[in-house]
């Protein structure tokens, strides 16, 4: 059975005065949540942060979304999104918002990546003092990138890389901002509500 058929279907009501919604399990069931992460949250565009938070080259921000750790990275030219795991032993690379300079270094075996996700160093990967063994291709072991789009100050990602172009996907949302000159909006402050024990569909 396909993953789509496993998801709960919303019934169409023949009576316009009757509304059917999702069953209670869709808000509290762990398996349902995992299915959402692999379908609806993987297929579309997800908001993950603001570009103004990544001002300098080397600024990084870890984000946990749809059950996956990612990291946003600013280099001299652009902002990238990567899976926040080392290509060697899958250890988390970045645990806090900070500036890493020119290199993202794994705290386990010191595998090091540049700000475009390319592997630059893999100490002793071939044995003691064997840092560049024959047959080991550095280009095959970079960070796994994630499709990203920046709309004004908002950063969006798409996990499976198959989403429609952002402007097409988000057309109904963008339409609501037609009367607002977004270029004049200025960041004022951040309201941090901490961790909220709820389901994403309530937010």
Identify the meaning behind each predicted range.
Residues 1-78, 112-203:
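Rieske [2Fe-2S] iron-sulfur-binding subdomain
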Residues 59-107, 111:
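Glycine-rich active-site/cofactor-binding loop and its immediate structural neighborhood
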């Amino acid at each position: 059975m396909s993953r789509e058929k496993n998801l709960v279907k919303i019934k169409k009501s023949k009576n316009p005065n009757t509304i059917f919604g999702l069953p209670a399990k869709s808000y509290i069931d762990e398996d349902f949540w995992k299915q959402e992460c692999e379908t609806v949250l993987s297929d579309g565009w997800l908001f993950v942060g603001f570009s103004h938070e990544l001002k300098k080259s080397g600024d990084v921000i870890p984000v946990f979304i749809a059950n996956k750790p990612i990291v946003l990275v600013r280099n001299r030219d652009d902002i990238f999104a990567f899976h926040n795991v080392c290509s060697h032993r899958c250890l988390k690379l970045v645990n806090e918002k900070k500036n890493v300079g020119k290199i993202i270094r794994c705290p386990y075996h010191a595998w090091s990546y540049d700000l475009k996700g390319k592997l630059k160093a893999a100490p002793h990967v071939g044995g003691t003092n064997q840092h560049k063994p024959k047959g080991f291709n550095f280009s095959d072991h970079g960070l796994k990138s994630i499709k990203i789009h920046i709309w004004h100050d908002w950063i969006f990602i798409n996990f499976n890389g198959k989403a429609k172009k952002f402007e097409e996907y988000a057309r109904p949302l963008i339409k609501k901002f037609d009367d607002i000159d977004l270029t004049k909006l200025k960041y004022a402050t951040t309201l941090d509500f901490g961790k909220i024990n709820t389901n994403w569909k309530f937010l």
